Amino acid sequence: MKKIVGVLVLIAIGLYLSLSVEAEKVEEEAVRVSDNPVFEEIYLAGGCFWGVEGYFQRIPGVYQTEVGYANGLTDKTDYQHIKDTGHAEVLYLKYDKNTVTLPEILAHYYRIIDPFSYHKQGNDVGSQYRTGIYYTDEATGEVAKAFLEEKQKAAKEKIQIELQPLKNFVVAEDYHQDYLKKNPFGYCHIDLDLAYVPLDREVIGH
């Protein structure tokens, strides 16, 4: 019996190490940028930010990610109080537009959320889990607006994604950053393997 337990422990350790190595490999591959990168940024709310970050960290051209809380009623908040302060869980993305375009970023975002769900994504319910696109420059806002308008034309239901200028952003606690890299078996409401599936017709304006 002890031998069996020992073998199972070794298998579990091996699997964990394998997943950790794979996570590092994914990060190295996904961070690829062009020889002459042009960086832009956007903030995306898509439910629990662990999965949203884990997904976009697999996309080549995504240079930096950081999870936090955005567009609330106050300039300060934390994980324990976002329900009261009205913030959404969001992912900050810094990307090289010469490697991945904004329409492609938006198409990736749209495929991993339920755009018709109000204040609910996966098993998570509440205003902090709403969907939203927040921008810091008008050009990004216009592209996002056109993208959502095209999606709405093809939809039978009302799209619940809010589109707003970024009002405020509070960086989340350290244990939330790179959560799925630190916890390979952690909760995730998103199919991360979708990151490797070509966008094809999902892209608008590219």
Predicted regions and their residues:
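Flexible coil/turn and secondary-structure edge motifs
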Residues: 2-206
